[in-house]
Amino acid sequence: MSYNSRNQRDSATINHKNQAVFNVEGVKVYYGGFLALIDVHLQIPDKEIIAFIGPSGCGKSTLLRCFNRMNDLIPGAKVEGRLHYRDRNIYDSRINSVKLRRQVGMVFQRPNPFPKSIYENIAFSPRANGYKGNLDELVEDSLRRAAIWNEVKDKLKAKGTALSGGQQQRLCIARAIAMKPDVLLMDEPCSALDPISTRQVEELCLELKEQYTIIMVTHNMQQASRVADWTAFFNTEIDEYGKRRGKLVEFSPTEQMFNSPNTKEAQEYISGRFG
């Protein structure tokens, strides 16, 4: 067994203060015949923020999409290995991927509000999925949880697309919250935002982790160090055909990752020697 595999397995059995919400065991991801991500072993602790960092093309977003089977929507994508969500193998043929995505919501890199009113951005999906409660209360609660209610409460009929970029991203977070998820996946949620909006989203994440597990892909190492409880460092390696493929190198508490990483690769990346 390689050092990398041993290190991953050691990381996967770390005693988190919270139980694992996801167990990743030997996951590989292919795009067509290309092996894009190799042999990942990882435990995701509940009600904490986990950051995925690493250079472009290292598999961060590829793994993130595995957690709610968004890779199913990519032609030719194939996932091998076991990925358990609260003791259920989510790649079992009996798992309903649509229901899974209600429990494991996703916020994308660029804000993508529906071309509808602010109110309908929140109410549309719950209504379409048979929500029987009070929609007005759900809309207000979701917007409050996303720390945007006070900014939009007097213009709920206005288009969501008319909001600023930072407001749109918080609206998208509110939209995800409205589906009552267990986990929130965030794929570089601040990459298109200005510093003030970025700070607002980071502060929101710190509040939301009291109720949700948050897994965040970020190219901003300072962001990872500010908000994450745990950090996973990914890197690339050259395969036998000269192509780069992604791998998980190290998974550690964030303070340890940024002060005394276990691997030379992580140390060199964090110190700015590459990436």
From Swiss-Prot:
It catalyses: phosphate(out) + ATP + H2O = ADP + 2 phosphate(in) + H(+). The keyword ATP-binding applies. Belongs to the ABC transporter superfamily. Phosphate importer (TC 3.A.1.7) family. GO terms for molecular function: ATP binding; ATP hydrolysis activity; ATPase-coupled phosphate ion transmembrane transporter activity. GO terms for biological process: phosphate ion transmembrane transport. It comes from Trichormus variabilis (strain ATCC 29413 / PCC 7937) (Anabaena variabilis). Part of the ABC transporter complex PstSACB involved in phosphate import. Responsible for energy coupling to the transport system. It is found in: Cell inner membrane. Its main location: membrane. Residues 22-261 form the ABC transporter domain. Pfam families: ABC_tran. The keyword RNA-binding does not apply. It is a peripheral membrane protein. Gene3D superfamilies: P-loop containing nucleotide triphosphate hydrolases. The complex is composed of two ATP-binding proteins (PstB), two transmembrane proteins (PstC and PstA) and a solute-binding protein (PstS). Its EC number is 7.3.2.1. InterPro entries: AAA+_ATPase, ABC_transporter-like_ATP-bd, ABC_transporter-like_CS, P-loop_NTPase, PstB-like. This is Phosphate import ATP-binding protein PstB 1. Keywords: ATP-binding, Cell inner membrane, Cell membrane, Membrane, Nucleotide-binding, Phosphate transport, Translocase, Transport. One of its GO terms (cellular component) is plasma membrane. It comes from the Bacteria. It is an enzyme of class 7 (translocase). ATP binds at residues 54-61.
